Amino acid sequence: MALRSIKSIAGSCLCSRQRRCGSSAAIFPEGIFRCLSPKFGQEFPE
């Protein structure tokens, strides 16, 4: 469930939809990636 994923990674970094966030990333309806790992704690501009 997308909602469960959002809750589980709340506060994680946001990544550009064109960038890879690492091995663990979830695609959201907005079309952005949210990194699941805190070590990818950077934001990439579009």
Curated annotation (Swiss-Prot):
Gene: ZNF689
GO biological process: regulation of transcription by RNA polymerase II
Subunit-level organization: Interacts with histone H2B. Also interacts with chromatin-binding proteins HMGN1 and HMGN3.
Note: Encoded in the 5'-untranslated region (5'-UTR) of ZNF689.
GO molecular function terms noted in the UniProt entry: histone binding
Cellular component GO terms held in the UniProt record: cytoplasm; nucleus
Biological role: Plays a role in transcription regulation.
InterPro entries assigned to the protein according to its UniProt record, in alphabetical order: SEHBP
Name of this protein: Transcriptional regulator SEHBP
Keyword Cytoplasm attached: yes
Major subcellular location class: nucleus
